């Protein structure tokens, strides 16, 4: 069987018709191939930094003062000055005081006089409001703290969300009790949301370059999610048949070769025990961004996204909804932005 082919990547980025051909070609790829592609890339990313991930676990325990030294009694192991913890807390406090507690921790400027005025009276206040509503200041400090512990602060994930909120429509007087009874109606409200993602849950192309968060050919964000979220995402355009087939399983097969013990490890970092009641089932979802490759490894569709779980393609391949383009790589930006206070030069 001949491999699925499409116009060249650069041609697809320049010509909408060529991109449509590439998107159509990606739809002809089997779900088994797409799931295998995501799994292979995740496994590649995980194995490439396996030793670093082991160091993360050690450094986390070192910061939490959970280190035991062989050849010493328990009381001797615990009788030490927690210098890593103190250093991290002091650095975090300095970051918060110098960057976050300041009312002018960032600014927006323009190139000419009209744009400067527009930036001052519109864009800067609007951006500050959006960042304040999504908790950017607090999550920035959390990321800096993780960065001082691990050397990698993790990832900030910006997304646009919409929810239904109650809005006061009026009030009436209760003739029996004399109380004022308000009336509400559900109205849609959209807002900027920000998730802070720990580095354990992100699998990035090992060929990515430092200080260039959109380099590399793929990035995967993996999270365990409950059944309720998957059922709700059917109305958001996910594949109903694929979601229902996934929900018919117990969720254990969705982990495949990666993150098989991630829930237990996350609970251990929180100093918790991992136990779930029999009515709660969770499934490992992989949100993938990158270039879709065919059976021979040739790019079929650039700047794509899809969501898979185990052997089920729940959404996509679809066009990356972010229209911002990274000038260094020429690709669409993905919503995950990495940051590190301790940058490795290579």
Language-model region placement:
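Extended, helix-rich architectural segments
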Residues: 1-345
């Amino acid at each position: 069987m001949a491999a699925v082919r499409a116009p060249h990547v650069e041609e697809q980025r320049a010509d909408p018709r060529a991109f449509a051909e590439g998107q159509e070609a990606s739809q002809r790829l089997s779900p088994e191939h797409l799931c295998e592609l995501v799994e292979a890339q995740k496994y590649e990313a995980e194995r490439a930094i396996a030793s670093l991930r082991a160091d993360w676990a050690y450094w986390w325990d070192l910061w939490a003062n959970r280190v035991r030294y062989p050849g010493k009694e328990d009381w001797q192991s615990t009788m030490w000055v927690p210098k890593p913890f103190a250093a991290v807390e002091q650095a975090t406090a300095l970051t918060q005081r110098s960057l976050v507690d300041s009312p002018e921790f960032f600014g927006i400027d323009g190139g000419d006089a009209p744009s400067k005025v527009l930036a001052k009276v519109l864009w800067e206040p609007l951006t500050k409001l959006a960042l304040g509503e999504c908790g950017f200041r607090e999550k920035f400090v959390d990321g800096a703290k993780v960065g001082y512990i691990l050397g990698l602060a993790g990832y900030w994930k910006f997304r646009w969300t919409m929810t239904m909120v109650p809005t006061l429509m009026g009030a009436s007087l209760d003739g029996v009790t004399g109380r004022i009874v308000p009336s509400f109606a559900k109205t849609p409200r959209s807002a900027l949301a920000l998730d802070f993602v720990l580095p354990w849950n992100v699998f990035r192309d090992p060929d990515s370059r430092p200080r260039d968060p959109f380099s590399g050919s793929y990035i995967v964000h993996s999270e365990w999610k409950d059944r309720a979220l998957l059922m709700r995402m059917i109305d958001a355009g996910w594949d109903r048949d694929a979601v229902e087939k996934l929900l018919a399983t117990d969720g254990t097969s969705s982990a495949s070769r990666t993150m098989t013990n991630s829930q237990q490890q996350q609970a251990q970092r929180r100093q918790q025990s991992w136990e779930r009641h029999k009515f709660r089932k969770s499934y490992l979802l992989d949100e993938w961004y990158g270039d879709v490759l065919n059976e021979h490894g040739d790019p079929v569709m650039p700047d794509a996204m899809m969501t898979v779980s185990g052997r089920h393609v729940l959404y996509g391949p679809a066009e990356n909804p972010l229209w911002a383009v990274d000038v260094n790589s020429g690709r669409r930006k993905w919503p995950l932005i990495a940051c590190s206070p301790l940058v490795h030069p290579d």
